[in-house]
A protein has these predicted regions:
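Domain-level recognition of soluble alpha/beta enzyme cores
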Residues: 15-122, 324-334, 345-347, 354
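Primarily recognizes the serine-hydrolase "nucleophile elbow" in alpha/beta-hydrolase
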Residues: 195-261
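Alpha/beta-hydrolase active-site loop
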Residues: 156, 162-218
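C-terminal catalytic-base region of ester-bond hydrolases, centering on the histidine
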Residues: 48, 68, 287-355
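Short substrate-entry loop that stabilizes the transition state in hydrolases
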Residues: 99-162, 274-277
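Active-site machinery of serine-nucleophile hydrolases
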Residues: 58, 62, 72-92, 133-174, ...
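The feature captures the conserved acid-bearing segment of alpha/beta-hydrolase catalytic domains
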Residues: 113-114, 244-305
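Fungal secretory targeting signals
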Residues: 1-16
């Protein structure tokens, strides 16, 4: 393809591509935490070790308290794997290694009212097979509007997880049968609850979260997710009373949440005709007994609910190349989509906190 040469010239020579900053009033700090659940054996680990979860925690910080820092969008091993996927589409294999985004390095911990501020906690579960890093821009946007966001990597589900010490866990090639996915959503739901417990631990504030202002508002803990992540959020709500509600972005719902429904608030947000193409949505929606909404976002497809639209926009591709990628990301304006999803999340958190 002709645009392959263009991409090679853009990112093949080490040119960084910085993603635009989000529109919320807060700057955002990010920390990474490897969390070992010593009370669970990982059912997908061939060595039967403890469940080992990795999370990126995005934290709102008042802008005057910040110094700008630029971070790689993906860690090296993850960028390499996704670069191979990009190459199969005619893009440079250095594409994902070139992306970066700005975050806040707190200059000092606010005192007085700022130190006592509490923020809602959003736990975000990715789509099946996806790295948590593929939602980093989205998480940063949510956090910029005053939410703490924890992005989870689910071991042996994500294509690859790269831990801070360089250790990697590759996909376990989990079958996509209904029985297997029901099991996986349960394991993922347990991951969600475990991460909530870890983020609420005072010890984390003395280590990974040290120097960040405010704390978690325990009355405003919500679970969100894309695709299988949304289904996992629904299952987590059934068993974890700390979660006040949840949201599914364009994902099929599985039992037991599908049949039992939920008492708590839940939003379904998806592409046009999702409810016609996926029978679980209408069934689940009918079984929701709390505040509920089914929201359609025009000109989106399943892949729109990741960072792909914003990443492709940042590449500034020729019109012909952008058109070729539209079936994967939709035709919605990426900036409008990012802002729209953030507004939906903010309204959902308010609905959740009113219960």
């Amino acid at each position: 393809m002709k645009f392959s040469l263009l991409l090679l010239s853009l990112v093949g020579l080490g040119n960084a591509i910085e993603l635009p900053k989000p529109n919320g009033p807060y700057s955002v700090a990010v920390r990474t935490s490897a969390m070992i659940d010593k009370h669970r054996i990982d059912p997908y680990d061939p060595r039967r070790g403890h469940r080992n979860v990795l999370a990126s925690i995005f934290w709102p910080v008042p802008s005057p308290s910040c110094s700008k820092t630029t971070l790689p969008y993906m860690t090296p091993a993850v960028a390499k794997l996704y670069g191979q996927k990009a190459q199969s589409m005619g893009l440079s294999n250095e594409t994902f290694a070139a992306f970066e985004y700005s975050v806040c390095t707190p200059l000092h911990t606010p005192k007085g009212c700022g130190s006592k501020r509490q923020f809602p906690l959003i736990i975000f579960s990715p789509g099946a097979g996806n790295s948590r890093l593929l939602y980093s821009n989205m998480a940063r946007s949510f956090a910029s509007f005053g939410n703490i966001v924890a992005l989870i990597d689910h071991p042996y589900d994500a294509d690859i997880i790269e831990f801070p010490d360089g250790k990697t866990i590759m996909t376990g090639n989990i079958p996509e049968t209904t029985k297997s996915l029901i099991k996986l959503t349960k394991v993922r739901a347990e991951d969600i609850s475990f991460v909530i417990s870890e983020v609420l631990q005072s010890s984390l504030y003395k280590s990974v979260l040290k120097g960040l202002p405010g704390s978690v508002d325990k009355s405003k803990i919500v679970a969100l997710g894309h695709s299988l992540g949304g289904a996992s959020a629904a299952v987590a709500i059934l068993s974890d009373k700390r979660i006040c509600g949840g949201m599914d972005m364009d994902g099929q719902i599985f039992d037991p949440a599908l049949s039992q429904g939920l008492e708590k608030p839940f939003f379904l947000v998806g592409r046009p005709n999702h409810s016609k193409e996926d029978a679980t949505w209408n069934k689940f929606f009918a079984n929701l007994r709390g505040s509920k909404k089914m929201i359609t976002i025009d000109r989106t497809v399943h892949g729109s609910f990741t960072d792909y639209p914003q990443l492709i926009q940042a590449l500034n591709l020729p019109a012909s190349a952008s058109k070729a990628i539209q079936p994967l990301i939709g035709t919605v304006n990426p900036s409008d989509l990012e802002n729209g999803l953030s507004k939906i999340v903010v309204s959902f958190v308010k609905a959740c906190s009113n219960i």
